[in-house]
């Protein structure tokens, strides 16, 4: 069983991580092509392209300039520990055991606008390049055109290494859009997390993102081998709703917080 998640805009490159054998990202030749395009932009152009502040734009212009194909422990950090958004708050990578991290290396992948697809212990350098960015490139008008079937091919290889051909989609629509799902030989299931608000259950973004991270944590700690076992997820007070679920969507609900 393989899970996929989105990356995060918030990064932590201050905290050092030791005790692991880090891996190299596999698609840096493609990353370099994107960096070469991004290096041509002024801070004002980056601010406009990414809809970010001038301060953030300047930071990312500097990041593009400093990015290098060589990834080592001095200039990079393992992706699982570098990302710090809501999903990763729910995942709590720092409190996982080494055995759980080792399992994650085989059963978890992170989608990325710059790196395409990352394993948890892949070294990455600080960047900001969301998958939805309309970055014109030789292959087309945006990153979906750029990555085309590359991410899908590498994802299939990771799925083929599993014993059950199950892909658990915990990524956002923006990032899963870079996967050509119809080309995958896999049973794809998407957990959906609904929180009660004023008596009605609905997706509340902050809670849903955190729940995706909690589901990854659940998978790393219980090592499920069937969709049935995924339904036992109960972290954070969520429970599986059989009636609201389908073959491809697993619905989990939680009472108002």
Swiss-Prot record:
One of its GO terms (biological process) is response to hydroperoxide. Signal peptide: none annotated. GO terms for cellular component: cytosol. HAMAP family: UPF0246. Belongs to the UPF0246 family. This is UPF0246 protein HAPS_0280. It comes from Glaesserella parasuis serovar 5 (strain SH0165) (Haemophilus parasuis).
């Amino acid at each position: 069983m393989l899970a996929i998640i989105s990356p995060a805009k918030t990064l932590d490159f201050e905290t050092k991580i030791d005790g692991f054998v880090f891996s190299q990202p596999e698609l840096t030749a493609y990353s370099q092509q994107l960096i070469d395009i991004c290096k041509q932009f002024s801070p004002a152009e980056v601010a406009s392209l990414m809809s970010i502040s001038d301060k953030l734009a300047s930071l990312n212009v500097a990041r593009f300039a400093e990015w290098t194909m060589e990834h080592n422990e001095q200039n990079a950090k393992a992706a699982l520990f570098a990302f710090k958004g809501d999903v990763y708050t729910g995942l709590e990578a720092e409190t996982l055991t080494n055995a759980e991290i080792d399992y994650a290396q085989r059963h978890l992948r992170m989608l990325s606008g710059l790196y395409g697809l990352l394993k948890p212990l892949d070294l990455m350098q600080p960047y900001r390049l969301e998958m939805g960015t309309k970055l014109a490139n030789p292959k087309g008008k945006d990153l979906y055109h750029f990555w085309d079937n590359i991410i899908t091919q590498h994802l299939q290889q990771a799925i083929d290494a599993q014993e059950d051909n199950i892909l658990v989609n915990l990524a956002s629509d923006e990032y899963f859009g870079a996967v050509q799902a119809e080309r995958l030989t896999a049973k794809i299931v998407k957990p959906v997390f609904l929180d009660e608000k004023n008596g009605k259950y609905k997706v509340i973004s902050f809670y849903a993102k955190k729940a995706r991270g909690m589901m990854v944590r659940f998978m790393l700690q219980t090592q499920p081998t069937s969709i049935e076992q995924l339904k036992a997820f109960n972290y954070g007070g969520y429970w599986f709703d059989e009636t609201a679920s389908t073959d491809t969507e697993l619905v989990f609900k939680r009472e108002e917080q």
